[in-house]
Amino acid sequence: SKNLRRFFGVSGSYVDPGYGKDSTKLLFFECGYTLSKINIELKKKGLSLLACGSNNGQTLPGVVSTNTHGSAFKFGATPEMVVGIHLITGPSSQVYLERASYPVVTKKLTDELGAELVRDDALFNAALVSFGSFGIIRGLMIETRDLFLLHLSRKFRPFNEALEKAITSLDFSGFTTYFKELEDRATDRNQFPVTFTEESLY
């Protein structure tokens, strides 16, 4: 599968009118792409994966099919970024699976891929984390996000009411002063203004 390394974006008549997000962040990667190669291609476009494990030598279908997860705060494991699955189901049969509740591409694209478009939530979810038992994954359509940089910041804090609230209900309202300190440090380090928002807690 390592020779299957085509990737492309979709736009215009290839995107379902019901897809309500930014289609420039949709990318299809064939099964031979490793995460390291995907990250190189995404960086050129100013984009990043929504989730990633600690090893970037695996192929994209490998991490998705085994439910590899990262440490994103408000996002789940790698399968959650997948919105389309191109499956080889037999010697002369291919399907392109999407959720019926979340249409992304049009039949025009799947026809060009030589696959039958199937929209079914249960089938999609079954094939998503299937450990390779649902067919051969030819490629995956994924959603991405804007490129970002993570910086480690550690500080010992007492286990008080504010910390307990953050842990149990993800309410960080007791940390506004600390986040302001992080903003100031990040602004100095990066030489451009960095502002903390709820969306920053990704």
Where do the protein language model's features map onto the residues?
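Short secondary-structure capping/junction motifs at helix and strand boundaries
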Residues: 46-54, 93-98, 149, 194-196
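A broad, structural surface signal
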Residues: 36, 40-44, 125, 142, ...
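Glycine-rich N-terminal segment of FAD-binding domains in flavoprotein oxidoreductases
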Residues: 1-18, 27-32, 36-54, 67-72
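Residue-level signal for helical boundary/lining positions with a hydrophobic bias
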Residues: 28, 58, 126-128
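Extended alpha-helical targeting/anchoring segments
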Residues: 55-60, 65
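Duplex nucleic acid-engaging cores and interfaces of nucleic-acid transaction enzymes
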Residues: 23
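FAD-binding subdomain of flavoenzyme oxidoreductases
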Residues: 63-175, 179
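Cofactor-binding catalytic cores of oxidoreductases
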Residues: 1, 69, 153, 173-202
